[in-house]
């Protein structure tokens, strides 16, 4: 009888362990290991949900200015510290109003249910605060492109991202360290 119970339980335990491993791998694939922010895959599902439910939503793309120089001058650990600081600042800024993600490298993304000019100014200020690292004050700067979903005739995430991306490059073209709305 005990052998029969064991024979029944062993495969079930195997499936439970396998399911747990898969769940962990899926969660890891949706979170950036350095910053803890959502990856593109994890962020996209949340962003699509947000823009469907909130017509006043906004999408922002953030690209660090002169990140390669910081990384090359102060080392990869300083670069990682800068990425973590930016992620923390962006996460704090989004708060319960939205979701932040890291697309890769030094590029970040956020979606918020609504955003005012004052909100965008607050983010700009936060992202431009220097980073205290190893007894040094390292300058941080970012170019931010923003798109209000309501500005587009059809609020598809791909179109909102494209508009925010164009706005971000416009901000970079204007000497960096700034924001640019998509309109």
Where do the language-model regions lie?
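Conserved nucleotide-binding and Mg2+-coordinating catalytic segments in signaling enzymes
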Residues: 27-45, 62-75, 84
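GGDEF/GGEEF active-site signature
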Residues: 87-150
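A short glycine-centered flexible hinge/capping loop motif at secondary-structure junctions
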Residues: 71-79, 104-105
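Short, conserved catalytic or interaction motifs in soluble domains
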Residues: 72, 113, 173
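Heptad-repeat coiled-coil signal-transmission/dimerization helices
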Residues: 43, 47, 82-83, 87-90, ...
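Signal-transducing coiled-coil linker helices
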Residues: 1-33, 40-50, 56
